[in-house]
């Protein structure tokens, strides 16, 4: 759900942090529905609790290198307001805080991970107490995680996946069609 919502949001002049935070809220809603978090998705994101499950940014620019130089602009221009907002919401792991412009090539890759060492660290430090249900989370310690990446180019009116609409199957219906169920 987060992946497709993010893909629909990528458009010229859209603040990247808004897209990143939308992905976090959608993922938090899913974790709440599984009983792994309590409260509201907004509270989980504001507390930084989603960094336990998505300890990376939503994506990155692509250009001369696979991971293009996001931080160059942040060193050259004053993004202090955005950086302050990111630090407060626990999204300081998001490297790209720019506004999206036509011609930008970037990735859309929200993910969810269950990293035992990170879970243990946050639990021991009492982080996200009242938000994360660490006892329920124990059942997912061996799950690992998942992240699906699409590469996107921003157009004058929106965006499109590089390679067109052809992608690997990712939904339950798509996967069942491939395996013949």
Residue ranges and their predicted role:
Residues 1-181:
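Active-site neighborhoods and metal-handling regions in enzymes and metal-associated proteins
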């Amino acid at each position: 759900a987060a992946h497709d919502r993010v893909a629909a949001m990528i458009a010229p002049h859209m603040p990247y942090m808004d897209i990143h935070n939308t992905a976090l809220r959608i993922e938090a809603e899913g974790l709440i529905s599984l009983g792994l978090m309590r409260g509201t998705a907004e509270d989980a994101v504001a507390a930084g609790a989603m960094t336990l499950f998505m300890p990376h940014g939503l994506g990155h620019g692509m250009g001369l290198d696979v991971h293009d130089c996001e931080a160059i602009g942040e060193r050259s221009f004053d993004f202090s307001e955005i950086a302050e907002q990111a630090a407060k919401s626990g999204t300081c792991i998001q490297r790209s805080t720019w506004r999206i412009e036509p011609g930008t090539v970037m990735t859309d890759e929200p993910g969810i991970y269950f990293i035992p060492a990170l879970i243990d660290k946050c639990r021991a430090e009492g982080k996200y107490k009242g938000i994360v249900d660490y006892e329920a989370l124990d059942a997912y310690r061996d799950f690992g995680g998942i992240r699906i990446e699409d590469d996107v180019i921003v157009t004058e009116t929106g965006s499109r996946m590089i390679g067109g609409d052809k992608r690997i199957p990712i939904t339950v219906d798509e996967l069942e069609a491939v395996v013949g169920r």
